[in-house]
Curated annotation (Swiss-Prot):
Keyword terms: Hydrolase, Lipid A biosynthesis, Lipid biosynthesis, Lipid metabolism, Metal-binding, Zinc
Family: Belongs to the LpxC family.
Name of the protein this chain belongs to: UDP-3-O-acyl-N-acetylglucosamine deacetylase
Annotated SUPFAM superfamilies: Ribosomal protein S5 domain 2-like
Class of the enzyme per the UniProt entry, highest EC level: hydrolase
Function of the protein: Catalyzes the hydrolysis of UDP-3-O-myristoyl-N-acetylglucosamine to form UDP-3-O-myristoylglucosamine and acetate, the committed step in lipid A biosynthesis.
Reactions catalysed: a UDP-3-O-[(3R)-3-hydroxyacyl]-N-acetyl-alpha-D-glucosamine + H2O = a UDP-3-O-[(3R)-3-hydroxyacyl]-alpha-D-glucosamine + acetate
PANTHER family for this protein: UDP-3-O-ACYL-N-ACETYLGLUCOSAMINE DEACETYLASE 1, MITOCHONDRIAL-RELATED
Pathway(s) served: Glycolipid biosynthesis; lipid IV(A) biosynthesis; lipid IV(A) from (3R)-3-hydroxytetradecanoyl-[acyl-carrier-protein] and UDP-N-acetyl-alpha-D-glucosamine: step 2/6
Biological source species: Pseudomonas fluorescens (strain Pf0-1)
Xref: HAMAP family: LpxC
E.C. numbers: 3.5.1.108
Length: 303
């Protein structure tokens, strides 16, 4: 049986919020079967919990924000991408502020944290959502689609009319496994344009952004001294974002996601449309791991 997973140990990290610029303390904790991923604002009294679910998404400007009343948690997508990538079903994410720390702008540091904590299988079957028919949402020329696929595949295309983008591929496709996620996707960093930074900061966004946690592009090229981690790092980061956004379904997916110029808002619209259309999906479990169409890393003890 493919079992649900949580963390073996509690683990902590510190960073800054990309948009708030605030110092944030992050604690990842094990959680019982069928808890899902639950964010906790530990700086509030009483502590406020926000389950990582599509229905709890409030803001989608520049990042995905979860809300519970007037309490929010910003920029959840990179951490959720790491949770999805390593097949973590249940965990508590405690924060000392309203935003998940940006770390280096990718999911890599969160993958390292989770692997350092160790993974533990739980005594319950892991639930997958299998896509049964096509579901699409569009906004102008932007599009996001689910189609049936025996596995989990994420295909994405961006379309930036800029020399840095025109000179390299703007499309990519990843046939998901924990290994392909860690190697091909997890280290892709968020990116932004120098020309946008002044506008963003006027609107209290990207206050913590720098070349330490993002790829910064100006009219001539990439400003980061060390360049890109992957030749297709820009579109790979969009795939990373999508994997995190899609994990707000609350379960791992069996199907293909296709995005064209999609972002956090459209990704969330697609999830909400899918959830409404009950004939477009089913929940499945696997008694025999060898018959499952998705491969996860075996749990290893924390070292």
């Amino acid at each position: 049986m493919i079992k649900q997973r949580t963390l073996k140990n509690i683990i902590r990290a510190t960073g800054v919020g990309l948009h708030s610029g605030e110092k944030v303390y992050l604690t990842l904790k094990p959680a019982p079967v069928d808890t899902g991923i639950v964010f906790r604002r530990a700086d509030l009294d009483p502590v406020v919990e926000i389950p990582a679910r599509a229905a709890n998404v409030g803001e989608t400007t520049m990042s995905t924000t979860l809300v519970n009343g007037d309490v929010k948690v910003d920029t959840v997508e990179h951490l959720l991408s790491a949770m999805a990538g390593l097949g973590i079903d249940n965990a508590y994410v405690e924060l000392s502020a309203s935003e998940v720390p940006i770390m280096d702008g990718s999911a890599g540091p969160f993958v390292f944290l989770i692997q350092s904590a160790g993974l533990e299988e739980q005594d319950a079957a892991k639930k997958f959502i299998r896509i049964l028919r096509e579901v699409t949402v569009e906004d102008g020329d932007k599009r996001a689609t689910f189609v049936p696929f025996e596995g989990f595949k994420v295909s994405f295309e961006i379309d930036f009319d800029h020399p840095v983008f025109r000179d390299r591929t703007q499309s990519a496709s990843v046939d998901f496994s924990s290994t392909s996620f860690v190697k091909e996707v997890s280290r892709a960093r968020t990116f932004g344009f120098m020309s946008d930074i002044e506008y963003l900061r006027k609107h209290n966004l990207a206050l913590g952004g720098s070349v330490e946690n993002a790829i910064v592009v100006d009219a001539d090229g990439v400003l980061n001294e060390d360049g890109l981690r992957y030749e297709d790092e820009f579109v790979k980061h969009k795939i990373l974002d999508a994997i995190g956004d899609l994990y707000l379904l609350g379960n791992s997916l069996i199907g293909e996601f296709k995005g064209f110029k999609s972002g956090h808002a459209l990704n969330n619209q697609l999830l909400r449309k899918l959830i409404e259309q009950k004939d477009a999906w089913e929940v499945v479990t696997f008694e025999d791991a060898s018959t499952a169409p998705i491969s996860y890393m075996r749990p290893v003890a924390a070292v």
